[in-house]
Amino acid sequence: MKKFFAALLAAVMMLALAACGGDSGKTVDVQKLADDLKDNVPYSTNMIASAVEDLEYKLDPPEGTAIAGYIADGSAYDMIVVAQCANTDDAKTLYANTQTYLDDLKREANLYQPGEEARLDGALLRQSGAVVVLCVSDDTAAATAIVEGYLK
């Protein structure tokens, strides 16, 4: 009887620990994916590396998020943001923050650069597991194909 209860207790503890672990899903190299998007997707202008601090300020990612990205070197709204969060819940939070940032950019573009608003509307914003990707480019389909390759 003692062995049965010991085995039952061990099983319950393992289930409890597994439930607390969170689901991080697929892990990606954020810099590699950002570089791949920069090198293989057309943009309206040259792309320059964005300081991580700038992205963190704009997107307010949860603690423990690895983030990389590029921005347009001119007045265009082209951008790449790739983030690997600690878990799916953090990724959902970052996705919502990124959507808010994208909506703010759309309002700004509507006032100052109406032509850019349509590009922002067609942007790739994707969350899969603990990964969040934003890509504003001239070819959303090409960006989507690259991202899907990393998330398989």
Language model region names:
Residues M1-F4, L8:
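Positively charged n-region of N-terminal signal peptides that target proteins for export
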Residues L15-A19:
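C-terminal motif of bacterial Sec signal peptides marking the signal peptidase cleavage site
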Residues G21-S24:
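Bacterial signal peptide processing site
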Residues V28-M47:
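Post-signal peptide N-terminal segment of mature Sec-exported envelope proteins
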Residues N46-Y77, D89, L120-D121:
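Short, compositionally biased low-complexity segments enriched in polar/charged residues
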Residues I71-D103:
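Mature extracytoplasmic domains of secretory-pathway proteins
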Residues G115-K152:
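A short, solvent-exposed beta-edge/loop patch
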